[in-house]
């Protein structure tokens, strides 16, 4: 729920029509690998329990020895990537605390990309709250 790996989004070129370069960099840290391994181990334990007997076949992938490589190569987010335009006052932030993109006059970002860290729950309520707060401070 709280990955420590960090990816990046960079511009391919100055043409706004061209898609950006997106590097998710999933499971790049030892901590993320460990958490994924623990989750898969728990799922395996549950599926091996009496409650599931007769409902499952033998495990096909990844096999006990290949778990880390499987997680590194196949693990990804189900949905809700966020944090690509981090909000903050530090030099690495993309926007200020009002969602204004640093160095681009007149452009604001108000979505889940502002979150420096993902929340434990659904992002919808947090994004609505950010949008309400930022829009309340805007003047027409």
Where on the chain are the PLM-derived regions?
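FAD-dependent oxidoreductase catalytic-site/capping-region signature
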Residues: 1-126, 134-140
């Amino acid at each position: 729920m709280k990955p420590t790996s960090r990816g990046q989004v960079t511009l391919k070129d100055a043409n706004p029509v061209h898609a950006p370069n997106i590097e998710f960099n999933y499971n790049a840290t030892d901590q993320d690998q460990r958490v994924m391994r623990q989750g898969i181990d728990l799922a395996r334990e549950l599926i091996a329990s009496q409650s599931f007997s007769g409902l499952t076949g033998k495990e096909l992938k990844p096999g006990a020895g290949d778990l880390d490589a499987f997680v590194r190569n196949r693990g990804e987010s189900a949905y809700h990537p966020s944090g690509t335009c981090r909000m903050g006052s530090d030099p690495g932030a993309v926007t200020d605390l009002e969602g204004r993109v640093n160095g681009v006059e007149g452009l604001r970002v108000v979505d889940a990309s502002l979150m420096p860290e993902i929340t434990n729950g659904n992002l919808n309520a947090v994004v609505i709250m950010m949008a309400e707060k930022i829009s309340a401070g805007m003047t027409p």
